[in-house]
């Protein structure tokens, strides 16, 4: 059986605005988050995403923060991944009209169980690989305050 499981202990528990601390994960629920409940849950204080032979995703699917817009922030996570490839999206946009309602695009910090994708900067649904592990990546806002 192929099982791809992503566990994010304290996912975004340490993510907060530089101006006023705001924890995004309470360690118990997915309050403030939106994702397919067939694939996302909280187990033992961790956010868990699963994609299995018995319960496969239909393409990429995401757990999306919906409880407000974050401006400047620090993000700190611990993760464990068993097979597969995943990542953390930031400064993302909703891909409307997609099959499962939880499809987004944007900048992604990749991680995986192997050694090919972990540490790369990826443009999900718009640019592909932006930089490889070890490359310096600098993202700047345009005149409208948006990432290019």
Over which residues does each language-model region extend?
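N-terminal secretory signal peptides that target proteins for export/translocation
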Residues: 1-3
